A protein has these predicted regions:
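Basic polycationic patches enriched in arginine
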Residues: 2-4
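A generic "folded-domain core" signal
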Residues: 35-181
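Bacterial N-terminal signal peptides that target proteins for export
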Residues: 7-23
C-alpha cells in the first residue's frame, strides 16, 4: 500500500484525469448524456480533490474527483478506486464510487462518516445513491467531515475498505457550483 500511496501523491492529477477518462468511456456506452471523444480538463486542485470540466453538446459536465488515502483488503487484480461528485449543467449533483473491482451482486456499498452511514447501490464497477435526496445528504456530510470510508464486497466475496480525505472538498464543491452553470 505504501507504494500505491506515494504513487498517488506524486501523480494524483494524472491518475485522476486517466480515471475520469475511463469513467467517461464507461458512460459513453451506458448513457446518452456523454458523447464520443469524452475528455475532461482539470480546472483546479483543492488539496485532496480535483475539479474537472467538459462540454457535451450544449451541456456542461463537471466532476469533483478524489482517490483514497488508505486502502485495505486483499483483492487480486484490484484496479484503481475513485470517488466522484458529478454535476451536469448545474442540475442535481450525483455521487458515485468505484472500488477497483466488480461488486458482488445484491450487496450494498457502505459509505460512512463516523457513525453516520449511507448505503449505495452497486452495478458492476460503480455504485450510486438510490435517490437524489441521499446524494444531497451525502454531500452535506462530506462538507462537515474530515474523511469518509467506503466499504464494499467484491464479486469474489472479499471485503475492501477505502478511506478518502475530505480536505479541500468544500472549497472544490463551491467552485463546481460556480463554474458549472
Amino acid at each position: 500500500m505504501r507504494g500505491r500511496a506515494s504513487y498517488f501523491s506524486s501523480n494524483k492529477s494524472q491518475v485522476l484525469k486517466s480515471l475520469l477518462n475511463k469513467f467517461l468511456l464507461f458512460f459513453f456506452f451506458a448513457s446518452p448524456v456523454f458523447a464520443e471523444g469524452s475528455s475532461a480538463a482539470l480546472q483546479e486542485k483543492f488539496q485532496d480533490w480535483s475539479l474537472f470540466k467538459t462540454n457535451r453538446g450544449d451541456q456542461i459536465v463537471c466532476y469533483l474527483a478524489s482517490t483514497p488515502i488508505k486502502t485495505t483488503g486483499s483483492i487480486l487484480n484490484r484496479g484503481e478506486s475513485f470517488f466522484l461528485v458529478t454535476n451536469i449543467k448545474n442540475d442535481a449533483d450525483e455521487i458515485s464510487v468505484a472500488s477497483g473491482f466488480i461488486y458482488k451482486n445484491n450487496s450494498d456499498v457502505e459509505l460512512s462518516f463516523g457513525s453516520k452511514k449511507f448505503y449505495l447501490f452497486p452495478y458492476r464497477i460503480l455504485a450510486w445513491a438510490n435517490e437524489k435526496s441521499a446524494d444531497i445528504d451525502i454531500i452535506k456530510e462530506m462538507q462537515k467531515n474530515a474523511d469518509m470510508v467506503v466499504t464494499s464486497v467484491s464479486s469474489s466475496g472479499k471485503i475492501a475498505s477505502d478511506t478518502y480525505s475530505l480536505i479541500g472538498f468544500t472549497q472544490s464543491y463551491k467552485q463546481l457550483k460556480k463554474i458549472c452553470k
